Amino acid sequence: MKKQFLSTLLAFSLAGAVNAEVVVGVTVSSTGPAAAIGIQSHNAIKLWPDTLGGEAARYIVLDDATDVSKAVRNVRKLTSEDGIDLLVGPNITAGALAILDVLVETKTPMISLVGSGSVVQPVNEGGREWAYKMSQNDNLMAQALVEDMQKRGFKTIGYIGYADAYGDSWWREFSA
């Protein structure tokens, strides 16, 4: 997965090879309710390479505090003030969905850290043509879970999920 991410990052960096530096903006939830995920993402960024495609790489990391409006403000700042070539994050579905319009306005590609397929599907709708993600979509995970439960003879299951964009996405998959 790391190689795939770095290859994608490299591909985006080569598109702007005129620049002497590849600027990658990152918005993650280092604080707030999703900090358990965001802190891990923030720490992983420290391991990223100093160069991408032979060009110097600079990473600008902002905390969106698990706040959708702050994620949007972060992305606006990163695109307008910092002139990023690529965005990584957010790490919550609601934040990733909220910034899609900014991606279209600024023509900035995003590699999202969320699990929900709603950030990238349907493709070419609502800014999703600028969105990519690292993990498999919910439907693949849900399909594997359902197949396993069927093999084990489960007839009835219960669903407990969060009342947010990610929980809604899972509910749709299990309801299909």
Located regions from the model:
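Gram-negative bacterial Sec-dependent N-terminal signal peptides
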Residues: M1-N19
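A generic secondary-structure signal
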Residues: L47-T51, K77, E147-R152
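Cofactor-binding loop segments of dinucleotide-utilizing enzymes, especially the Rossmann-like FAD-
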Residues: S29, D64, Y162
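Beta-alpha junction/loop-to-helix N-cap segments that form part of ligand/metal-binding clefts
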Residues: V23, A36-N43, T51-P122
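Glycine- and acidic-residue-enriched helix-capping/strand-helix junction motifs
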Residues: G32-N43, A165-R172
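Extracytoplasmic ligand/sensor domains, especially the bilobed periplasmic-binding protein
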Residues: I84-A176
